[in-house]
């Protein structure tokens, strides 16, 4: 729950809805519709273990968006190609490496056609040799798609490379924020230095 302020997505409040010229706490239906525009990729992948990579990417579009199976599969195959895993479409998560599972999780989130992607420490549980695979997918998304990404990471070089804005958090609060050049080259706060 937001403690203070209002978050907007597409110029509409995310957790509140307009009513009689004021913002009031949003109804469950309003929240559900707004949440469907946000994709989330977790640190631990959270793939459905009983489903193949392809099925992991088609379940939500079929169940939530009401897509026909064929349409959802076509979209999922395009996304698996984007993350370099078309050849793994029929594999279950237990047969995939950590980096491959994370790339399927990214494709699954993208299958919902989000406006915003939340990426929570998506490389922290990966072996160092596969971190690059996942970062390359994020680089590609950053360059080729008009997609806002909010990423929690300890990969400072990567954050500097792809970000247009960096927020440094300490004890749950924003300590300093600004363009990457400012945060990394000329931080204003002692803690950030």
Over which residues does each language-model region extend?
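ABC ATPase "signature
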Residues: 177-178
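H-loop/switch region of ABC-family ATPase nucleotide-binding domains
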Residues: 153-154
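Conserved signature/switch motifs of ABC ATPase nucleotide-binding domains
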Residues: 91-94, 112
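Catalytic Walker B motif of ABC-type/P-loop ATPase nucleotide-binding domains
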Residues: 117-120
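Short coil-to-helix segment of the ABC ATPase nucleotide-binding domain corresponding to the Q-loop/switch region
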Residues: 51-59
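Helical segment within the ABC ATPase nucleotide-binding domain
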Residues: 132-144
């Amino acid at each position: 729950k937001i403690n203070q302020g209002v978050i907007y997505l597409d110029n509409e409040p995310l957790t509140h809805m307009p009513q009689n010229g004021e913002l009031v706490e949003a109804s469950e239906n309003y929240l559900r519709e707004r949440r469907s525009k946000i994709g989330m990729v977790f640190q631990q992948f959270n793939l459905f273990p009983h489903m193949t990579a392809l099925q992991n990417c088609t379940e939500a579009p079929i169940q939530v968006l009401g897509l026909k199976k064929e349409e959802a599969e076509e979209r999922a195959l395009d996304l698996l190609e984007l993350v370099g895993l078309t050849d793994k479409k029929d594999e279950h998560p237990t047969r995939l490496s950590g980096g491959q599972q994370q790339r399927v999780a990214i494709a699954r989130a993208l299958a919902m056609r989000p406006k915003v992607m939340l990426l929570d420490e998506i490389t922290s549980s990966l072996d160092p040799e596969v971190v690059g695979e996942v970062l390359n997918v994020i680089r590609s998304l950053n360059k080729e798609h008009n997609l806002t990404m909010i990423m929690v990471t300890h990969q400072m070089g990567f954050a500097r490379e792809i970000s247009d804005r960096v927020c440094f958090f300490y004890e749950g609060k924003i300590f300093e924020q600004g363009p990457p050049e400012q945060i990394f080259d000329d931080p204003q706060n002692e803690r950030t230095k």
